[in-house]
Amino acid sequence: MKKLNVGVIGLGQRGLSLIFTILACEEANIVAVSDIVEEKRKAGVARVEEIRKTTPVAYENYEDLLKDPNVEAVFIASSWEEHIRMAIKSMRAGKITAMEVGCAYDIEECWELVRVYEETKIPFMMMENCCFDKFELLSTSLARAGKLGEVVFAHGAYSHDLRFEMLENNYNYRLGNYLKRNCENYPTHDLGPIAKLLDINRGNRMLSLVSVASKAAGLKEVFPKYEKGKKHLNDAVKQGDIVTTIITCANGEVITLTLDTTLPKHYSREFTVRGTKGYCVQEANMVLFDCKELHDFYEPHKALQRWMDNGENYNAYLPDMWRNITQKEMELGHGGMDYMAFKAFFKAAINGDPMPVDAYDAAAWMCITALSEQSIAQGGMPQPIPDFTKGKWLTRPRLDVMEFPTVSED
C-alpha cells in the first residue's frame, strides 16, 4: 500500500490529539513535527515514538519542515490566524496540504488561497470533520434519495460554552479574537455540512448574508474567577455572546447560523434541514416525514417524546463506513468523524481524486467570518458573498464527502 509521509504543524491540544488519528490510518507515516514551543515538540515526537516506534524530525520553524524533502503531505493545526498563510506556503512548497478548520480575517486571504491552489494544482483539503458526522451524512443521504422533498431551509450552530477553555489554557488563542473582533468566528462546523448538502460551489452558491450580534456579557462575567481573566477586567470584550447570520443561496434556499460560545448551554451544532416532504433535527436525533400525526401535537415536548432518537431507524441510508464503524475508530476523535475525514483525505491524495472539501469550499465557508464582521459593524447590512469559483459553480458536478447507498423501499 502506498503511504504518505506527513508533517504536522502545530502541536497544541488539537494537533497533538490528531497524531493518534493520523497514525491510525495505515496510509500515513508522520516523519516531521513543528511547533514554536519546545515542550510541545517533545510531546509530539514522544507520541509518534509511542505509536509507531519511529522518531520524527522536530522543527521549531515550520518553514524548515516545508523544506524537508521527506515530507510529502502537511497537516496544519496552528492558530486560526496562521491557517491560510501556512496552507499557501505549503502548497507553494509542493506539499499535499490538509488544513484544520478556522475563520478568515479578510476576503483577500480567501482569494489568495484559491489563486495559489489554481496556480500550483497541489491537492488541498480543509479538514472539516463535521461534514463526516453521522447525522449530517444521514440527512444528506435522505435528501439525495428524495425523502425530504425539495430542501428550502437549513440551520446550524456552534453552541459550545468555551469560557473555561479560553481562560484555563495559557496557550489558547481564542481569547485574543474575542477581545478584538465581533463576528461569526467559527462558521465551518455548522455551515460545512449544510453547504455540502445544498451543493454549494457545485450547482449552487451563497449570494449574500446579514449578521447581527447580541451584547457581550458572558465572558466578562467570569473574568474574576480566573487568573488569566483578571488581567482583562478593565478590557472591553467585542465578541457578542450570540451572533445570528442569515445566508441566501442562488437556488432559493436560506441558511441560518448561530454562534453561541460564551453563555451556559449544552454542546450542539443544531443541524436542521427542512424540505417539502420532511425534516431532520440533529439535537433530537430525529427524522420526520409529512404525515397527519405531525399536526396532532400542540405542545412541542410531546412531539419530541414520540419521535426522539428515531434517526436510528434510517441507518440503512448511512454510508458503509458509518454502518461498519468500530469502537476503536469512534474513539479516534469526535465519535469517529475525525478518523473518517483523514481516511477521505489520504484516499484522495493517494489516488489523485478530487478532495471532498477543496480550496473553493474553504474560501466560501471561511469568508463568512470576515463578511459577518462587516455586516455587524454596519448594523446588519447585507454583504455580497464572492463567487470564488468565478462561475465554475454552474457546471462543477456534485461531490459528496462519501458515497451513499441506494436503499430499496420494499
Can you name each region flagged by the protein language model?
Residues 257-267:
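Glycine-rich phosphate/pyrophosphate-binding beta-alpha loops
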Residues 245-251, 275:
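Active-site beta-strand termini and strand-to-loop segments that position acidic
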